[in-house]
Amino acid sequence: LCEKFKVQRLVELNCVD
């Protein structure tokens, strides 16, 4: 979900799929 969380800058924490 990197793209979805990328906006919230949580790509590092929630970058699973």
Curated annotation (Swiss-Prot):
Work out whether the entry's keyword set contains Cell membrane.
Answer: no
Which domain of life does the protein's organism represent?
Answer: Eukaryota
Q: Chief location of this protein?
A: secreted
A GO cellular-component term linked to this record: extracellular region
List the coiled-coil residues. none
**Tissue specificity annotation:** Expressed by the venom gland.
Q: What does this protein do?
A: Shows moderate insect toxicity coupled with mild effect on mice.
Protein name, as recorded: Toxin Plt
Instruction: State the organism of origin.
Output: Parabuthus liosoma
